[in-house]
Structure formats: C-alpha cells, structure tokens
Amino acid sequence: MARSQASTSTAKGAGFTLHTERLGPLPLINHFIERLGLHDTLSRHVASDARCAVSHASALGVLLRSIIVEREPIYRQQETVHGFADGMFGIGERDMALLSDDRLGRALDRLFDADRTALLTELVLSVGQRFGVRFDEFHNDSTT
C-alpha cells in the first residue's frame, strides 16, 4: 500500500487510531543485509565524500532492496521507497526525499570505479564467517 494510500481509521468510541504501513519482505531482507554487514562493506569500498546528501552505500542498499522486492526502474526508486514504511529501504524519511535517479546513478558510477574484486571477496568471506559456510571445495571460476 503506498504511503499516500495508507489507511488511518478511528475505532468507534475507543479513541484509537490505526495506521497501516507496507513492510513486504523487507524485514527479512534487512535482517540478512545487516547480518552480512553489507552497508559497512559498501561504505569501505564505495566511498562517499562530504557533499553527498545520501551516501553511495545507502543508495546502493536502496537499489539492492528494490531489485529483490519490486524490480522498478531507477527513475521510479523514490516512489518505490515511499510506498513502504519508513526505514525499510535502509534510509530515513529525510534521505527518502533526497533520493533521485541522478544520485543513484552516481552511486552506480562509484561502484563501477571501486575495486569490485576486493568488495566481492570481502562479502564472500563475510558469508562464510557469519553463516558458517565452508569453502573446502569452493572454486571461483572467474574466467566466464
């Protein structure tokens, strides 16, 4: 349910207000993203400067969650984020207002320029350590 469509109703005589927000699968997705330490890893490998209103790591986190949940084009990310409860996409209400396709594009440019090999290696090792995945017979075929 979109934020603009969120229902608010008052129970008869009780004085209670019911406020409904859309969560979808994001609490579960956020659990695994946090357990992986993905935001910290992205922050280390895809650095933002002080001029960025929304860090590149946060913008990339929004895109990742969007791909998993909604698969909307980049130009519709702000609408997608506003359709869910505050914080579900890893950014607060203030940052949601600052999200734009230009800002997301700059984050993707920085990701392209980053040392993606080191980033992916750190993420794979993080999965192994935090989820108990054994790599005894793991072969990374990077030729394809």
Regions found by a protein language model. Give the residues of each.
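Dynamic "connector" segments at or just before major functional cores
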Residues: 1-144
